[in-house]
Each structure stands twice: as structure tokens, then as C-alpha cells.
From Swiss-Prot:
It catalyses: ATP + (ribonucleotide)n-3'-hydroxyl + 5'-phospho-(ribonucleotide)m = (ribonucleotide)n+m + AMP + diphosphate. Keywords: ATP-binding, Ligase, Mitochondrion, mRNA processing, Nucleotide-binding, RNA-binding, Transit peptide. The keyword Membrane does not apply. GO terms for cellular component: cytoplasm; kinetoplast; mitochondrial mRNA editing complex. Essential for RNA editing. RNA editing in kinetoplastid mitochondria inserts and deletes uridylates at multiple sites in pre-mRNAs as directed by guide RNAs. ATP binds at residues 59-61, 86-92, 111, 159, 209, 307-309. It comes from Trypanosoma brucei brucei. This is RNA-editing ligase 1, mitochondrial. Pfam families: RNA_ligase (PF09414).
Length: 469
């Protein structure tokens, strides 16, 4: 928008109008120069509904400070099951189903409150029909599962994201968002994020990560579904994209995830696997206790959900924070977690991979077996192993290469046509799976080889008696 030169009376009326229409404490910026008075363009929002009693705020997720991690270890929760899911870079968004006695109303919320139906919030109206069907299906599933006659309030929280994918072979969205008042906006003009990465799709999407419900409708009666229940319900809702575990294990195993080199798998899930973007790092991950929300877990009064961001993203989002992140997380929290898991960086599960890639990943890892390890060792021979000529690292590499070689012989051509990024991921995964197996078996193998060698050496013949004996 070009700046407009304004006379004083018109300026006063416009500034006053902006203040009256917006509940956000944002004032238009007035610039005075020698050539006149200018009003800078400021985004103003439609007023929120006066009654926000149905709004249920989403919590701010904590960063993994050293003190928080220590508290989790002291409470005993750190040794229990946690999951790490991708942290999608978008804007917080909630889908509400509110029981008003004789009927149910669907409403939509941003982080600060339920929105006026005519607020243009990043083009979400284009997805309203899908959202409405999904929240109603979810409501029916909940009532059926728990034997409920009604649900007072149901909230599906997630992230609105997308509308940006700068690849020369991927066209911009041609869709338009139409508000109830008739105003129209192109999805291609939506800008949820300004950072160059991560990018997901030229179309607008929703990524669900939490479900909570209140039978009475009262805020104090809300029940937050644990992760496994969340997945159970989300998987039954048609076309719902939801948070799936990249890693499942102890808190340390989740913290050991290599967030610094994690490329977002979402474009592939959204059909853009053949059009990867170089350096398309994920923002990070969210790590949560699988029973977050359970009173038995929450009674410890410690954080049961934390977020990790890669330092490259932090530098873009908050310039100058990269050093702080390194000092407060990479050199402390994550290094401590890596020590406790003995340096094993957890391999990404196939839950966030499309069907073909997931099947290929399973097939490849199945090739890393005890039988294959025995075959590799037989090719090496006993002496090089016992003398140290062939090291444990050498065996890992030989096992990984052998598994990969046979995998390529039997795999479908579809897999050979997957993205370069996925093929690199396969190589990484087969290496770490080989490393895990060799480390698990190494001590036992070396003892067996040593015992076999001692049995193979014939006993020394008794010395011949010397003359005079």
C-alpha cells in the first residue's frame, strides 16, 4: 500500500476510526516530515465478539531450560514415555464446536480469542466446510467412545500454515477466500510467515496437535486427550493432518533428536515430494509427555510440553539469539541428553513419511538383521576382528552397505523415483539401524570369536625329555 498524504482533520478521523474498530493495542504509526503528515499502513482487525466466555486459551509452550529438564528428571517423568512431533511454522488456530442447548455452533479462534466471522484471518474461510465436517465427526466419535449424550464444548487446536512454496515448477495457489460479507482475497496473497524456511505448500492447510473437551462446557471441566487418544481420534477424521511422533521414548531420547538438521517432511506428505526445496529445515519439534493432561502426571507441577527450535530458524526469527540458544540448549540440555543416551541420535520413525516411502523404509530396515551381520562377519574372518584391523565402525559400514545393496535389488522402481532428500534419509536410517545392531551384539561377538580361536589352536605337544632325565 502506498502512503497517503493526509490533512490534519482527515488524519484525526482516520486514526480515531482505527482505534475504535480494533481491540488490539496497536496504534497507527504517524510520520511527520517537512512535506506533510503521513499515516503508515497498519493491519486492523475486525472487533472480537463481545462475549469471549466460550474461548479457551492455548498455553504458551516452554523452552527446554536446564532447570526445567532437571525438574522433570527429579519428578521421575523424564524416564516415562514422551513423543517428539514436528513444530509447524504457522499461526495458532482453534476449531470450536459449542453446544447451545437446542443446537451446536462452530466457531473459529486465533490465539487471542474467537473471531468475528468477517475477520480475514489468513484466508481460513476457504477451509470452513472441511473444518465444520471434521469437528462434527470428531464430536460424534467422542460421544460414541465415552458414552456421552452431549459435549458442551469441543476444541481442536492446531496450526494454520502454508500458502507459500517458492519452487520454479510449483505454481502459486489460484484459490480465492470469500468472507461472509462478500469480500474476496487470493490465497496467493496470504503471508502467514516471512521467513524463507520452512515452506510447505502453495495452498492453505491445517495441522492438528491437541483435542480437548468439556462435557458441561465449563472451563474447569476440560479434559485434554493424551497423545495416544489424540492419534486414535485424529486418524478417524477424514483428511485431517495431525501431529505424528517422529521419536517416541524417554525425554532424553526425544531431546537427542537432531533438530539442527531436520528437513520438514510435510511437503512430501502434501504431494510435493518431487519438488524439494534446498535447505528446507523444519522450525523444530514439540516434545510432550504421552499422558500430558492426566492429573497423575500434572500433579508434579512441571512442564509436560516443551519446544525445540533449530538455531538456523532462531537466527531468522530472532536475530542475535543463535548464540543464546547454543549456550542455553545445544551446549547444555541437548549435550546432556546425548550423554545420557550414549550419543545415539534417534532415527526418525516412518510415521511422517508418505505410504510408499514408509514401506520402503520398513523394507530396508528389515534387511538389517542378525543373519546378515553373521554373513558380513564371515567375510571378514576372525583374525582381522580380534587384531583390531577391522574395527566396530568398519563392521557397521559393511553391514549398512550390504543391507542397502540387497534392498536395491528387490525394491520397486517407485522407490528409486522418490526424492533425493528421501533417498538420503534411507541411507541415514540404514546406517543408524546397523550401528544399533552392531553395538548391541559387539561384546558377545568378540567373546565368541575369541573362544572359537582358542578352541582352534591345537595344544602344545609335551617337550621331549633331554638326555640324562
Amino acid at each position: 500500500m502506498q502512503l497517503q498524504r493526509l490533512g490534519a482533520p482527515l488524519l484525526k478521523r482516520l486514526v480515531g476510526g482505527c482505534i475504535r474498530q480494533s481491540t488490539a493495542p496497536i496504534m497507527p504509526c504517524v510520520v511527520v516530515s517537512g512535506s506533510g503528515v503521513f499515516l503508515t499502513p497498519v493491519r486492523t482487525y475486525m472487533p472480537l465478539p463481545n462475549d469471549q466466555s466460550d474461548f479457551s486459551p492455548y498455553i504458551e509452550i516452554d523452552l527446554p531450560s536446564e532447570s526445567r529438564i532437571q525438574s522433570l528428571h527429579k519428578s521421575g517423568l523424564a524416564a516415562q514415555e514422551w513423543v517428539a512431533c514436528e513444530k509447524v511454522h504457522g499461526t495458532n488456530f482453534g476449531i470450536y464446536l459449542i453446544n447451545q442447548g437446542d443446537h451446536e455452533v462452530v466457531r473459529f479462534a486465533k490465539r487471542s480469542g474467537i473471531m468475528d466471522p468477517n475477520e480475514n484471518f489468513f484466508g481460513y474461510h476457504i477451509l470452513i466446510d472441511e473444518f465444520t465436517a471434521q469437528i462434527r465427526i470428531l464430536n460424534d466419535l467422542l460421544k460414541q467412545k465415552y458414552g456421552l449424550s452431549r459435549v458442551g464444548r469441543l476444541v481442536l487446536n492446531g496450526e494454520l500454515f502454508g500458502a507459500k512454496y517458492k519452487h520454479p515448477l510449483v505454481p502459486k495457489s489460484e484459490k480465492w477466500c470469500t468472507l461472509p460479507n462478500g469480500k474476496k482475497f487470493p490465497i496467493a496473497g496470504v503471508q502467514i510467515q516471512r521467513e524463507p524456511f520452512p515452506q510447505y505448500s502453495p495452498e492453505l492447510h491445517f495441522f492438528a496437535f491437541d483435542i480437548k473437551y468439556s462435557v458441561s462446557g465449563a472451563e474447569e471441566d476440560f479434559v485434554l486427550l493424551g497423545y495416544d487418544e489424540f492419534v486414535e481420534f485424529s486418524s478417524k477424521v477424514p483428511n485431517l493432518l495431525y501431529a505424528r511422533a517422529l521419536v517416541r521414548g524417554t525425554l532424553d531420547e526425544c531431546l537427542a533428536f537432531d533438530v539442527e538438521n531436520f528437513m520438514t517432511p510435510l511437503p512430501a506428505l502434501l504431494g510435493l515430494g518431487n519438488y524439494p526445496l534446498e535447505g528446507n529445515l523444519a522450525e523444530g519439534v514439540v516434545i510432550r509427555h504421552v499422558r500430558r493432561g492426566d492429573p497423575a502426571v500434572e500433579k508434579h507441577n512441571v512442564s509436560t510440553i516443551i519446544k525445540l527450535r533449530c538455531s538456523s530458524f532462531m537466527e531468522l526469527k530472532h536475530p542475535g539469539k543463535q548464540k543464546e540458544l547454543k549456550e542455553t540448549f545445544i551446549d547444555t540440555v541437548r549435550s546432556g541428553a546425548l550423554r545420557r543416551v550414549r550419543g545415539n541420535v534417534t532415527v526418525i520413525s516412518d510415521s511422517m513419511l508418505p505410504q510408499v516411502e514408509a514401506a520402503a523404509n520398513d523394507l530396508l530396515l528389515n534387511n538389517v538383521s542378525d543373519g546378515r551381520l553373521s554373513n558380513v562377519l564371515s567375510k571378514i574372518g576372525r583374525e582381522p576382528l580380534l587384531s583390531g584391523e577391522v574395527s566396530q565402525v568398519d563392521v557397521v559400514l559393511m553391514l549398512a552397505k550390504d543391507a542397502l545393496k540387497d534392498f536395491l535389488k528387490e525394491v520397486d522402481s517407485l522407490v528409486l523415483n522418490t526424492t533425493l532428500a528421501f533417498r538420503k534419509l534411507l541411507i541415514t536410517n540404514v546406517y543408524f539401524e546397523s550401528k544399533r545392531l552392531v553395538e548391541q551384539k559387539w561384546k558377545e561377538l568378540m567373546q565368541e570369536e575369541a573362544a572359537a580361536q582358542s578352541e582352534a589352536i591345537p595344544p602344545l605337544s609335551p617337550a621331549a625329555p633331554t638326555k640324562g632325565e
